[in-house]
């Protein structure tokens, strides 16, 4: 097809502003789905995506649309995730487009994550078409929200499209606006082939399926292609487009979006954001924008049953294919045995990975509390990055201890300002600015230690603001801090998986609360169990879990006291011996309790 009749666009929207419903509306308006095939959130094909109502993986669909100018257009929708943890996925999807539809809920207005993605789209020089969705709601305020978009985003909203994806209002207007406003791709089919990978996943039958946006040249079935970042060559076995079901083709030309299957078995050969080129005459320069993603949050994942260790490795390998941002390495814990230290983009990402491992691979897992990466300068001048508290050097060897800071942008209704400011102050935050967008909505900017964010910041923000506040964060750098390692000892033995790094000012309080929490969660034993919180050799809190006692004197009716004493002494001896060799089982809830302890 002539590139001038191709349009590539994506939809930017906050969670719950109706992006997936709008995508469903576009599919049915262009006749891509018959009534029999329709189901809600058609593009969210992961069970978890439907259940949580969020888009996790990027998807693509090619729509044929006959415009009012009489021409047939090929419109490629590249669906993007909206959550802050997946911003790299969003940036790759946006790099594959020339335009974006900004969907804003006419009742709720602009949210923090929408803004972050709009700025990404602007950096990629995309044509942005604003759309007010859910216009049929009684609480919709189209004029107010249109003004808010003009003020916060700086887009001209004079001819803003009013739509309701659910009631099928304004869908054709959106399609016409895409044809009219989004520029056709700049495509030269005579050049050396180059294509941008914006997603990939593992299929049990075909191997790796790679989603690409052709930028230059042509790739045909049977061609030898090269992945530039990993320097691997493969032959194209199958290729085509999603309409929305796979439609096989023999060629993909510049400007088009489609999939390529090469029978790739090794997950690590395909990096999202990489460039595909011809193996015979490779391009000299890859496409801009590829970056290896650095995980920001780390946690240990261990199988409950040790024999599941190999299955966990296979499962992580398979997930890594769909999720290039997940990293993992072997970790050995004295308390939990062998497992993996996994790196994630953020907390939602961590939850989703854990849930997918349990759901799709039927694994029973224990996850330790998440930690962030710290930077330590030792007394001998060497630098180290610390991902796991158990690897922390002795305090006398540390010259400088730095922790990562993030810039957090919060959008909230004015009613909840007080609670949110208190939460940020509790979390050692430094206020940067506060700006009223309207008389009912305010933007607050804080600089926060990332360590405080990974604990329970998001949950508490949502409960303080009854779910109305939204947040967006970006990493700003490392700063020196007074941090210590807090150990939890059970019967004098440090449980490595329960160690965490905290600010010295909070250590005493956090240690006491944790010891109390452990006392509630650890089941009582036949002997007394001491639960202690310690910094180095100094014990800062202690709780004692009482023993379960069997009444050994029950069978003595009356009689001599020395008989009873003998039985009690014998019981005491037994308990002492038991305590010496006994092993206390720590339940999964205890590992998660670290997250839920509020200072």
Curated annotation (Swiss-Prot):
List the source organism. Answer: Bdellovibrio bacteriovorus (strain ATCC 15356 / DSM 50701 / NCIMB 9529 / HD100)
Record-given protein name: Elongation factor 4
Q: Which family does it belong to?
A: Belongs to the TRAFAC class translation factor GTPase superfamily. Classic translation factor GTPase family. LepA subfamily.
Q: Which domain of life is it from?
A: Bacteria
Molecular function as annotated in GO: GTP binding; GTPase activity; ribosome binding; translation elongation factor activity
- Functional note: Required for accurate and efficient protein synthesis under certain stress conditions. May act as a fidelity factor of the translation reaction, by catalyzing a one-codon backward translocation of tRNAs on improperly translocated ribosomes. Back-translocation proceeds from a post-translocation (POST) complex to a pre-translocation (PRE) complex, thus giving elongation factor G a second chance to translocate the tRNAs correctly. Binds to ribosomes in a GTP-dependent manner.
Going by the record, the broad EC class of this enzyme is hydrolase
**Gene Ontology CC entries for this record:** plasma membrane
Per UniProt, GTP binds at 16-21, 133-136
Q: According to its record, how does it sit in the membrane?
A: Peripheral membrane protein
């Amino acid at each position: 097809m002539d590139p001038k009749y191709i349009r590539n666009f994506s939809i930017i929207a906050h969670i719950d502003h109706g992006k997936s419903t709008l995508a469903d509306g576009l599919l049915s308006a262009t006749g891509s789905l018959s009534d029999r095939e329709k189901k809600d959130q058609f593009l969210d094909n992961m069970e978890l995506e439907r259940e949580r109502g969020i888009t996790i993986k990027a998807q693509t669909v090619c729509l044929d649309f006959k415009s009012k100018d009489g021409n047939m257009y090929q419109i490629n929708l590249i669906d993007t995730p909206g959550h802050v943890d997946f911003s790299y996925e969003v940036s790759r999807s946006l790099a594959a487009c020339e335009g974006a539809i900004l969907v804003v809920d006419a009742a709720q207005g602009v949210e923090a994550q929408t803004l972050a993605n709009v700025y990404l789209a602007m950096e990629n020089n995309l044509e942005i078409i604003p759309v007010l969705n859910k216009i049929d709601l009684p609480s919709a305020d189209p004029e107010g929200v249109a003004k808010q978009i003009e003020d916060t985003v700086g887009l001209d909203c004079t001819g803003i499209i009013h739509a309701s994806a659910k009631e099928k209002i304004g869908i054709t207007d959106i399609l016409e606006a895409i044809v009219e406003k989004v520029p056709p791709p700049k495509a030269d089919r005579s050049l050396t082939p180059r294509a941008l990978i914006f997603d990939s996943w593992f299929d049990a039958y075909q191997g790796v399926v790679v989603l690409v946006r052709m930028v230059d040249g042509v790739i045909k079935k049977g061609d030898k292609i090269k992945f530039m970042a990993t320097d691997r060559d493969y032959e194209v076995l199958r290729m085509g487009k999603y309409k929305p079901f796979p439609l096989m083709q023999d060629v993909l030309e510049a400007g088009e979006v489609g999939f390529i299957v090469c029978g790739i078995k090794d997950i690590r050969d395909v990096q999202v954001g990489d460039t595909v080129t011809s193996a015979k005459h490779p391009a000299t320069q890859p496409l801009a924008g590829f970056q290896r993603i650095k995980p920001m949050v780390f946690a240990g994942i261990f199988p409950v049953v040790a024999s599941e260790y190999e299955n966990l490795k296979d499962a992580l390998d398979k997930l890594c294919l769909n999720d290039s941002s997940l990293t993992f390495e072997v970790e050995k814990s004295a308390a939990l045995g062998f497992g993996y230290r996994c790196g994630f983009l953020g907390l939602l990402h961590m939850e989703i990975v854990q849930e997918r491992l349990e759901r799709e691979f039927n694994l029973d897992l224990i996850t330790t509390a998440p930690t962030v990466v710290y930077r330590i300068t030792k007394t001998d001048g060497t630098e180290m990055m610390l991902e796991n508290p158990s690897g922390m050097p002795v305090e006398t060897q540390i010259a400088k201890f730095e922790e990562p800071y993030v810039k957090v942008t919060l959008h909230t209704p004015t009613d909840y300002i007080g609670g949110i400011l208190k939460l940020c102050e509790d979390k050692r935050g430094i206020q940067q600015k506060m700006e009223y967008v309207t008389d009912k909505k305010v933007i607050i900017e804080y600089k926060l230690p990332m360590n405080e964010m990974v604990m329970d910041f998001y949950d508490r923000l949502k409960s303080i603001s009854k779910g109305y506040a939204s947040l967006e964060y970006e990493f700003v750098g490392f700063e020196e801090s007074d941090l210590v390692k807090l150990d939890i000892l059970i019967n004098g033995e440090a449980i490595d998986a329960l160690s965490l790094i905290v600010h010295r000012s909070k250590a005493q309080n956090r240690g006491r609360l944790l010891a109390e929490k452990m006392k509630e969660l650890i089941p009582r034993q036949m002997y007394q169990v001491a639960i202690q919180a310690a910094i180095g050799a100094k014990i800062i809190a202690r709780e004692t879990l009482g023993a379960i006692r069997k009444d050994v004197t029950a069978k003595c009716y009356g009689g001599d006291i020395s008989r009873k004493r003998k039985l009690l002494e014998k019981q005491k001896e037994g308990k002492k011996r038991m305590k010496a060799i006994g092993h206390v089982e720590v339940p999964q809830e205890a590992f998660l309790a670290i997250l839920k302890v509020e200072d």
